[in-house]
Amino acid sequence: RPGVVSRGYGRKSKQPSSVDAASNPDDGGDEPVLIAKRTQVPIRVDVDRRRAARYLIAQGCNVIVSDDGLQHRALPRTLEIEVFDSQRGYGNGRLLPAGPLREPLRPADVRVGNGLPGDQDQAFAMHLQMTQCYHLNSGELKALDAFRGKTVQAVAGIGNPQRFFNALAEHGLTVQEH
């Protein structure tokens, strides 16, 4: 039974808490709530990932996924899976502020390249495909194609938002980026 541990970046509370699909992002963090809605697995947010993992294990989880956890070396691991943006790669290979890396590259057991051609030797390929929009107030899902030809206000709070904006444009939306 899998469980997810996360720091819960952006949440207002700093107390450890469990997150589910009904959780408020202010309490659990944006990403943990989205993960909960998508997976329905137990999620624990805590600045101390070891404590969060112990909590989930006590709840019956036998596989722990640490969201954005490669830099948290205090959490023991059996397998490291690194997901990277194949368009940007590792940039110049340097650490911030001279480059894009938050920490030195370390060996990973599995590398997965988002947008990577499938013929690469050192990594698996994956491709994200946007198909639906989620209405933040009502929770309603709509096919992205329902907005073809319309002008949309697109807001992104991610490190490389251009891929998101480009994907919307590829679906025929006129995008005003924010």
Q: Language-model features: where?
A:
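Short hydrophobic segments within beta-strands
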Residues: V5, V83, A154-V155
